[in-house]
Amino acid sequence: MSKVLILFGSSTGNTESIAQKLEELVAAGGHEVTLLNAAEASADNLADGYDAVLMGCSAWGMEDLELQDDFAPLFDEMENMGLKGKKLAAFASGDMEYEHYCGAVPAIEEKARGLGAEVICEGLKIEGDASSDPDAVSAFAEDVLKKL
C-alpha cells in the first residue's frame, strides 16, 4: 500500500471533480489517499510522508500559460515540496479554444522531473469535468495504480 497525495487547483470545479474521482479509484486500489485543495496547502515539505503525488491544475492562456490562481504559488515553490524520489503524475481540465489547452500537465511534469521526481505515466488532459470522459479518468488511474 502506498500513501498518495492528490493536490489540485480548481476554479470552476472541473479539476476538483477529476481529483475526487481519482481519489475514489486510487483508494479502491488499496492505497491511502489524501485529497488536498491547493487553496489550503503550503509548499513546504508538502510531499513528506507520501510515496506519490498526483497534481491537477486547470490552465488557460492565449499567449502565456496561466495556472489556476490557488495552484500557481505552489507551482512557483515546487522546489520546497520535497519531490525528489517521489512518484508523480499530472492531470488537468481545460478548454480546447485556448492555445495552452491543459498546459499545466507538461509544465508540472517538466518542473517535477527537474526536481528529481519520477513522472510515472502520461498526464491526463480532459475538456470539462470527470464525467466528460470517465474512460480517460479510469485509464489514467489504472496507469497510476500499475506504477505504485
Swiss-Prot record:
Keywords: Electron transport, Flavoprotein, FMN, Transport. Transmembrane segments: none annotated. PROSITE patterns: FLAVODOXIN (PS00201), FLAVODOXIN_LIKE (PS50902). Its cofactor is FMN. It comes from the Bacteria. The keyword Transport applies. InterPro entries: Flav_short, Flavodoxin, Flavodoxin/NO_synth, Flavodoxin_CS, Flavoprotein-like_sf. One of its GO terms (molecular function) is FMN binding. Residues 4-145 form the Flavodoxin-like domain. Low-potential electron donor to a number of redox enzymes. Belongs to the flavodoxin family. NCBIfam families: flav_short. This is Flavodoxin. It comes from Desulfovibrio desulfuricans (strain ATCC 27774 / DSM 6949 / MB). The lineage of its organism: Bacteria, Pseudomonadati, Thermodesulfobacteriota, Desulfovibrionia, Desulfovibrionales.
